[in-house]
UniProtKB/Swiss-Prot annotation:
One Pfam family per UniProt: Hormone_recep
This protein's name: Mineralocorticoid receptor
SMART domains membership: HOLI
InterPro entries, per the entry: NHR-like_dom_sf, Nucl_hrmn_rcpt_lig-bd, Nuclear_hormone_rcpt_NR3
Keyword Transferase: no
GO molecular function terms listed in the Swiss-Prot or TrEMBL record: estrogen response element binding; nuclear receptor activity; steroid binding
Organism from which the protein derives: Sus scrofa (Pig)
Function statement: Receptor for both mineralocorticoids (MC) such as aldosterone and glucocorticoids (GC) such as corticosterone or cortisol. Binds to mineralocorticoid response elements (MRE) and transactivates target genes. The effect of MC is to increase ion and water transport and thus raise extracellular fluid volume and blood pressure and lower potassium levels.
Cellular localization per UniProt: Cytoplasm; Nucleus; Endoplasmic reticulum membrane
Length: 164
């Protein structure tokens, strides 16, 4: 659940960045949230958090290649409940993607010698995803629990059998 929520919210930020230059939250072509819709939502603060991630994409002028590597790193930041068959192989894979992100940042023509700072900003952005995703999962769990509490169960004797 955590990995799925992480990827979904990161992808939402990317779509918002690409389709609306982060002016709106772009869930889907027919579901775009402006500030007013965010306010009407029960998850206004979470929408603001997702919007902030998208605004960071604009500020950093994130490339698709950086986004893709960061997405993989988000996946690799979650260890399965059952553990790993090979912790060493997992760490090696994660380290390789971190190195790849560092290479990508170094090759970026817009950096002009500030690659270490950009790398720091990108990894800081990844770190900020974890708090947001934890809050999103908590909201989903709370909403699920509330919906379960509102379920009405009727005694079996009230059930009407269909006429045959």
């Amino acid at each position: 659940q955590y990995s799925w929520m992480c990827l979904s919210s990161f992808a939402l930020s990317w779509r918002s960045y690409k389709h609306t230059n982060s002016q709106f939250l772009y869930f889907a072509p027919d579901l775009v949230f402006n500030e007013e819709k965010m306010h009407q939502s029960a998850m206004y603060e979470l929408c603001q958090g997702m919007h902030q991630i998208s605004l960071q994409f604009v500020r950093l002028q994130l490339t698709f290649e950086e986004y893709t590597i960061m997405k993989v790193l988000l996946l690799l930041s979650t260890i399965p409940k059952d553990g790993l068959k090979s912790q060493a192989a997992f760490e090696e894979m994660r380290t390789n993607y971190i190195k790849e992100l560092r290479k990508m940042v170094t090759r970026c023509p817009n950096n002009s010698g500030q690659s270490w700072q950009r790398f720091y900003q990108l990894t800081k952005l990844l770190d900020s995803m974890h708090d947001l995703v934890s809050d999103l999962l908590e909201f989903c769990f709370y909403t699920f629990r509330e919906s379960q509490a509102l379920k009405v169960e009727f005694p079996r004797c009230w059930w009407r059998s269909s006429p045959t």
